[in-house]
Amino acid sequence: PDTFSTKMVRFATRSPDGSAVVFESLGKLFIKKGDERPVRLTEHDTGFEYYPVWTPDGRQLVYMHWHDDALASLKSIDLKQGKSRSLLEAKGHYIEPSISSDGEHLVYRKLSGGRLRHGAFGERPGLYLLNLKSGENSFLRRDGADAHFVGDDIYFTDRKRPTGRNSDTAKTVLFAMDVTGNSVREIANGLLATQFRVSPNKRWVAFREHYQVFVSPMQQTGKSVPLGPKVKSLPTKKLSVNGGIYLNWSNENSLSWSTGPEMTTVTLGDAPFTEESATETINLSMQVETAKPSGTLALTHARIITMNAERDVIESGTIIVTDNRIEAVGASDEVEVPLGAQIVDAKGKTIIPGIIDAHAHGRYGEGEIIVENNWNTLAHLALGVTTQHNPSSSAKLAFASAEYTNTGQILSTRIFSTGEIVYGAKSRSFAPVDSVEDALSHIRRLKAQGAISIKNYNQPRREQRQQVIEAARQENMFVVAEGGSLYHMDMNLVVDGSTGIEHNVPALKMYNDVTQLWQATNVGYTPTLVVTYGGLTSEDYYYQQYNVWEHPILSNFVPPSVLRPRSVRRVMAPESEFRDDDAAAVAKTLMDNGVTVNIGAHGQREGLASHWEMWSFVRGGMSPMQALSAATINPATYLGMDADLGSIEPGKLADLVVLTKNPLENIEYSDDVSHVMINGRFYRADTLAEQVTGDRPAPKLWWR
């Protein structure tokens, strides 16, 4: 669509008097007052703005301004005058600022260097205190996160892990300390809690567990008080319906949280555990334009592997692209190039549809910082992966990155995701499901944030997995299921109506009982050969076959510190030890029986592994055309996107890969990429500098 409504609103925080809300969307901070439309907070035209926090008087906001080169700087802005000033400019990675009640001090967390972020300027990470009057900057402690002032104390959280053989399991602990970093004491703890927030009057403590928001009375007994929805020693009230993030108190008794674009505020009365509390919900979504080019481009005289229903191959063909969609495709002597169109002579080249990776875990940010140039997604794009579906990710990062991409804030693949998995194991990611209603709560939360799919991940009982499937059906979402290397569970998941099975079925052969059953369903199969169960994987195999660290495209984008360790110090083993070709042969059997089989590179090796998936499918018996189908039209169909993606046909989005050689002759030519087109924009593969359709320069990466 030409426009869309933003969903992944982040950092939403009410002003102290409750009259306004500040939030981040598309990398910029906005303020919304009452029913008025949101307005930009600053006039920064470069970089991204994160972590807004109000001063106690509500007259100023402190925030972090991010540049990939300059890194983080902490700034404040006077809301009346609209003027910004820098509070901390020393190069570093700063997040989570919080201001003292007297407005004189700022506590923040410094991160060490990152992988997507610059690897340096992270010396002595931890919690710091900045005196806003004198500018004195003091180190408080190494451990701790989510620090926030309450009165004269700083509260923060940390994980307390077992130290002895018979010790308790790890807990999330709420600590308090004074402004010097001393007098540290434990206040509360939760086995599965992910966030604590203390109210300004120290009467309440809000916490997040199982993705839901709870509140309990604050107890300062000198001992750590256990908190949780099932703890009986203190009254606890569940406040959210479909979960929430970004917990914040705006005054003594008003707690806010976000679920997608909606911000909910609950005002606790004198008896919140026996009476209903006043609740207000506002929608912070904005209608924004999708970025796309304008004009017409003709790619002429190329071999075109269309991946249409007939799998037509045009030996000397022309593709006409207008704006961001394919207008015409056919033999060059039959397709008329419009007057005024820009022309790219692709003689000798082969063009395939953009590769769609159906199971692509990826890094979209660190510490909720989405970088301007993400070498991970850029490497995927340079190698022809134009669409990624991530079946397990951080919703706050994946869906925000998708919106940044759709509006042209960053250059990236198309990003789709499940967000967080609906996980059945006891952990801080635990998503308990004991009814369809429980499943609906998780699914509605993820859908509100931007999910198109749900990851049904190791719920232990079959009825629980069925409840997730039924809830997803009610919400018109599709369900990808973690196979978990359990054959019988895989068969249950097929019979119960999952959209697809992720990871290979742990069997060396597939017989008629399974193929006849599976072909009677619409369940797809994404075996993720790069992480094959049962033996050495395709990733191991291709490290053995090639000097991957020397790949001319991959090595241009992936830092040597990331690329070289696994690829240089590689496993060497006899051919018989590898199981990716055996798993591929099983997938071939299913494909021959009508099952939709897809590539899914698991986020391994930054785009090149998507090609390894195809190569291993051919090693397992597929033809190159079948392997290309598994990388293009099959996943497009599987993900419900085949009306727009997956083949080179009129009306579809212009996502194309220009290859220097013909992969139908040798599938291992598929990674010899010359150019990539995504959404109608044309880029050199080796640098991702835009050509012909615009002049966007090659992305600048921190490590080179």
Labelled PLM ranges:
Residues 305-318, 331-333, 608, 623-628, ...:
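Acidic, glycine-enriched loop/beta-strand segments at the rims
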Residues 310-352:
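Histidine-rich, glycine-flanked metal-binding segment
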Residues 442-460, 497, 504-620, 693-695, ...:
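Active-site neighborhoods of metal-dependent hydrolases
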Residues 1-2, 221-238, 277-278, 282:
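Surface-exposed loop and turn segments in beta-propeller and other repeat-based domains
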Residues 1, 5-7, 21-36, 43-49, ...:
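A flexible loop/linker signature enriched in serine peptidases of the S9 family
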Residues 188-193, 229-248:
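Conserved blade-ending motifs and adjacent loop-strand segments that build the rim/top face
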Residues 346-365, 372-485, 499, 512-559, ...:
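Divalent-metal coordination cores built from histidine and acidic residues
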